[in-house]
Amino acid sequence: MKIDILTLFPDMFTGVFGSSILKKAQEKEAVELRVVNFRDYTTSKHNSVDDYPYGGGAGMVLTPQPIFDAVEDLTKETERKPRVVLMCPQGERFTQKKAEELAEEEHLIFVCGHYEGYDERIREHLVTDEISIGDYVLTGGELASMVITDSVVRLLPGVLGNHASQVEDSFSTGLLEHPHYTRPADFRGMKVPDVLMSGNHKNIDEWRHKESLRRTYTRRPDLLEERELSKQEKKWLEQIKEGK
């Protein structure tokens, strides 16, 4: 996979893309990450990429020319048109399902905005997707693009050493992840549940499944509205509601 990120602040990505999973993914050649300063594409004699909005108003608006030219340059040798994703608070809310969808692509281009917003023609005639990572305001789209890149890249084949860990992550199954424990078995009187040390894998799996359901019910009940519960899950949920 290839991911290009268009930004005015490329230095922001150095630490994130040079660490942890994203660094390993590049070393394994599972992904090629490129950070491009779209100011390099401006034809303005003042090297500007924004201008005052027509009709007046506060703030500056990103002009279409440098972003269009950057995307066209990055895709001039590609046979299949890539997904061009705008980081935008008005966009579709980012979810695990969306990450899995994007992970199927060969080439992604993320456009990070700044200032007051984008010229509407970028939305209408260039991008294929608009994505928001939450209902809050960020200074620019850079942090959002880092979040999405990490979420997508870790799904690529061979990136994570433990596939089971990926499958069990929160949201991958539609439920929040179950609690985890490690040594010591008794820490200041706080003990690990006996079932986890029983060696009975069937009981352990059932405990983890039920605790995932419990955690989802108490913390993110909205996720259960989107999930078709099995007969056993419905039974557990009734027990959970009764405090069992």
UniProtKB/Swiss-Prot annotation:
Keyword Nucleotide-binding set for record: no
EC number(s) on file: 2.1.1.228
Catalytic activity from the UniProt record: guanosine(37) in tRNA + S-adenosyl-L-methionine = N(1)-methylguanosine(37) in tRNA + S-adenosyl-L-homocysteine + H(+)
InterPro entries named in the record: Alpha/beta_knot_MTases (IPR029028), tRNA_m1G_MeTrfase_C_sf (IPR023148), tRNA_m1G_MeTrfase_TrmD (IPR002649), tRNA_m1G_MTases_N (IPR029026), tRNA_MeTrfase_TRMD/TRM10 (IPR016009)
GO cellular component: cytosol
Alphabetically ordered keywords of this record: Cytoplasm, Methyltransferase, S-adenosyl-L-methionine, Transferase, tRNA processing
Family annotation (CDD domains): TrmD-like
Record carries keyword Cytoplasm: yes
Entry binding sites for S-adenosyl-L-methionine: G113, I133, G134, D135, Y136, V137, L138
GO molecular-function term, one example from the UniProt record: tRNA (guanine(37)-N1)-methyltransferase activity
Pfam families, sorted: tRNA_m1G_MT
UniProt main location, coarse: cytoplasm
Protein location: Cytoplasm
A Gene Ontology BP annotation from the UniProt entry: tRNA N1-guanine methylation
Stored HAMAP family: TrmD
UniProt subunit comment: Homodimer.
Function: Specifically methylates guanosine-37 in various tRNAs.
PANTHER family linked: TRNA (GUANINE-N(1)-)-METHYLTRANSFERASE (PTHR46417:SF1)
Family recorded in the similarity comment: Belongs to the RNA methyltransferase TrmD family.
Name used for this protein in its record: tRNA (guanine-N(1)-)-methyltransferase
